[in-house]
């Protein structure tokens, strides 16, 4: 999976 999946962006 892409590394971006590791990041949880705030709404």
From Swiss-Prot:
Coiled-coil regions listed in the entry: none
First and last residue of the signal peptide: none
An annotated GO cellular component: extracellular region
Disulfides per UniProt: none
Record keywords: Neuropeptide, Secreted
Location of the protein in the cell: Secreted
GO biological process, one term: neuropeptide signaling pathway
Function comment: FMRFamides and FMRFamide-like peptides are neuropeptides.
Protein family: Belongs to the FARP (FMRF amide related peptide) family.
Name of the protein this chain belongs to: Extended FMRFamide-10
């Amino acid at each position: 999976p892409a590394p971006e999946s590791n990041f949880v962006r705030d709404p």
